[in-house]
Amino acid sequence: MSQTEKIEEPVPSYLCEEPPEGTVKDHPQQQPGMISRVTGGIFSMTKGAVGATIGGVAWIGGKSFEVTKTAVTSVPSIGVGIVKGSVSAVTGSVAAVGSAVSSKVSGKKKDKSD
């Protein structure tokens, strides 16, 4: 064997750029959307709505269609809400958000002189 001959060894599959055939045949990978990129993968999707929780604050975006009497085509409308400590429910294409709102009401304070 001369020094000019090179022996090529097979490259392991994990060093190749493309995955080996058959590993992703039934489960194609989905590209991350904008919500996934913004929240770092912490998101949940329901029918007709997208929601995310960041630091205890729930972000909910609902998508619905409104049809008016004068328009024949449907006009898409997007609703977005930020709710802290809430319970959200989505049914069909209607996004509903319910929360317990605690308003800060300052009462009349008495002075020490009274």
Swiss-Prot record:
Coiled-coil blocks: none
Segments crossing the lipid bilayer: 40-60, 78-98
Membrane disposition: Multi-pass membrane protein
UniProt keyword Membrane, yes or no: yes
Record-linked InterPro entries: UPF0444
UniProt superkingdom: Eukaryota
Subcellular localization, as worded in the UniProt entry: Membrane
GO cellular component terms attached to this protein's record: membrane
Main location: membrane
UniProt keyword annotations, A-Z: Membrane, Transmembrane, Transmembrane helix
Disordered: annotated segments: 1-33
Family affiliation: Belongs to the TMEM263 family.
Entry function: May play a role in bone development.
Record PANTHER family: PTHR31443
Name of the protein in its database record: Transmembrane protein 263-A
Organism from which the protein derives: Xenopus laevis (African clawed frog)
